[in-house]
């Protein structure tokens, strides 16, 4: 019975990974997002699964992930921010998830996610980037 449940779960996960998403990253970002997958069902908001890697030699206390949804004309339709995993050691990778509670996402929409701020352990200063401008450039260049 456990074998059947495992197969059914694996099939369900593969069937639900149907919304493509791109990474938008500032050149000097201390955190890199990889392995992004958006899972959705008809009766629940989509969920983003991602791997976050600290690309620095310093321990990070916290970071923020931002997801952008653009319509087919390149207009920003929605934006959602969420805290990432707490404490990423130097060069460490951790997986996390984010519920995308941004309303309806059409199959023709473009989704992008990235890290727009991070803070080192023991520091009051934040690294920040304007990912919206970068994401808008990508969407505009893809439209041409």
Spans of model-derived segments:
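Short, hydrophobic/aromatic beta-strand segments
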Residues: 59-65, 76-81
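Positively charged n-region of N-terminal signal peptides that target proteins for export
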Residues: 1-4
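Hydrophobic beta-strand positions in extracellular immunoglobulin-like domains
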Residues: 52-54, 69, 100
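Bacterial N-terminal signal peptides
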Residues: 7-15
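Low-complexity, acidic Ser/Thr/Pro/Gly-rich terminal tails and inter-domain linkers that flank the onset
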Residues: 19-51, 55, 129-130, 134-143
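Intrinsically disordered, low-complexity Pro/Gly/Ser/Thr-rich segments with frequent PxxP/GP/PP motifs
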Residues: 77-106
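Terminal connector regions
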Residues: 101-144
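Short, acidic/polar linear motifs in exposed loop/turn regions
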Residues: 54-59, 73
């Amino acid at each position: 019975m456990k074998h059947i449940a495992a197969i059914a779960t694996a099939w369900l996960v593969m069937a639900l990974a149907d919304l493509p998403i791109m990474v938008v990253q500032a050149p000097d970002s201390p955190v890199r997002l990889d392995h992004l997958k958006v899972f959705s069902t008809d009766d629940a908001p989509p969920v983003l699964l991602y791997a976050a890697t600290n690309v620095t030699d310093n321990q990070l206390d916290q970071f923020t992930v931002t997801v952008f949804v653009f319509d087919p004309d390149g207009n920003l339709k929605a934006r959602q921010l969420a805290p990432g995993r707490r404490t990423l050691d130097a060069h460490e990778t951790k997986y996390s998830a984010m519920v995308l509670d941004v309303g309806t996402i059409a199959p023709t929409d473009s989704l992008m996610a990235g890290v727009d701020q991070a803070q080192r352990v023991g520091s009051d200063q934040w690294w920040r980037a304007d990912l919206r401008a970068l994401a808008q450039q990508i969407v505009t260049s893809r439209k041409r």
